[in-house]
Design a protein with these regions (language model features):
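Membrane-interface capping segments at transmembrane-helix boundaries
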Residues: 11-18, 79-87, 280-287
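C-terminal membrane module of polytopic membrane proteins
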Residues: 201-208, 232, 238-287
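Alpha-helical transmembrane segments in multi-pass membrane proteins
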Residues: 1-12, 16-78, 101-104, 127-129, ...
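Juxtamembrane "helix-exit" motif on the non-cytosolic side of transmembrane helices
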Residues: 38-52, 116-124, 192-199, 249-256
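Membrane-interface helix-boundary motifs at transmembrane edges
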Residues: 12-23, 86-94, 166-174, 226-230
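Membrane-interface helix/loop boundary segments of multi-pass membrane proteins
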Residues: 108, 155-183, 197, 227-231
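Hydrophobic alpha-helical segments embedded in the membrane of multi-pass proteins
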Residues: 208-224
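Central hydrophobic cores of alpha-helical transmembrane segments
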Residues: 23-34, 178-185, 234-244
């Protein structure tokens, strides 16, 4: 996770700072190392076959348990570090009045984007059925609870991207230029899963182009919310919602919807226009 790199740098360069959340940082770096080992093992270890002859890795559930257990310890150490240390290193959760409004705005924009996409594909009636299904809302609120048990994954990105790298790039390339460049960095960071998870390698380049559209446009919105609230938990929660609401509102109620997608070059222009109109407009607002 990018956050682990930030923490390692702070542990080395600011080890004399009494406000450094040392225990919290050390734990997160160690957790990241464990997840790296598990990831490598899942790639190198031979895959098993389930009863349906589908390939699966025995390391996948192990990684889930590590993330869940790690998230529990994460919250304990974060709270134990104290307000002063959290405030000194951007871990504080303040300005919740405006923060909640930003999160609700994102949910509204996300659903608007979903409705437009369904309308363009002629599936608006199916989306209406999904929204009217009580199971959808049960799963939705279950997903919200799961945030607390999977937080390390989203914190791991956003503490590195939004808390550390965004201000650094904005200082060098301007408020807007820094955010756009960060979106490009964020997109490239997703390159392996673009080729081997979201799609198959033959569609990898189209998936990467689509990732640039998503990361730049969504990154603009997330950057705005962070500058507006100075609350790192806002982009963390938005990142979580963005990754998980598709599972709910696609009607599949399964993360499998993210895997082996069909992404074609002809889809990119429409996605670019729609994402910039829905998320990118905030670049013209003052934070």
């Amino acid at each position: 996770y990018p956050a682990a790199g930030v923490m390692m740098a702070y542990l080395i360069t600011k080890k004399g700072d009494k406000n450094l959340p040392t225990a919290f940082y050390i734990f997160f770096v160690a957790l990241t190392a464990v997840l790296v080992v598990c990831t490598a093992a899942s790639v190198l270890a031979p895959q098993n076959r389930d009863l349906m002859s589908m390939p699966y890795s025995q390391w996948a559930p192990i990684m889930e348990y590590v993330i869940i257990g790690g998230s529990v310890i994460f919250w304990i150490l974060l709270l134990k570090s104290g307000k002063e240390k959290r405030r000194s290193y951007g871990l504080n959760s303040e300005h919740w009045n405006i923060s909640i409004r930003m999160i609700l705005l994102f949910i509204g924009l996300y659903l608007l984007r979903f409705v437009i996409a369904c309308a363009l594909s002629g599936q608006l009636s199916e989306f209406g059925k999904i929204m009217a299904n009580p199971t959808t809302w049960i799963i939705f609120f279950t997903v919200l609870v799961n945030f607390f048990l999977s937080v390390v994954a989203f914190f791991g990105e956003e503490y590195g991207w939004r808390y550390y790298l965004q201000p650094l790039l904005q200082k060098k390339f301007g408020l807007k230029g820094g955010v756009i460049l960060l979106g490009c960095v964020w997109a490239v960071w997703h390159l392996p899963i673009d080729f081997f998870y979201y799609t198959t390698p033959d569609m990898g380049l189209a998936a990467l182009a689509s990732q640039f559209v998503t990361c730049i446009s969504l990154g603009i919105f997330m950057a705005y919310t962070y500058m507006k609230t100075q609350n790192i938990w806002v982009p963390i929660i938005i990142h979580f919602l963005n990754n998980n609401m598709v599972v709910v509102f696609s009607g599949t109620y399964s993360a499998d919807v993210l895997q082996n997608q069909q992404i074609h070059w002809g889809d990119i222009p429409v996605a670019l226009v729609m994402n910039l109109l829905i998320y990118g407009w905030v670049i013209f607002l003052k934070p």
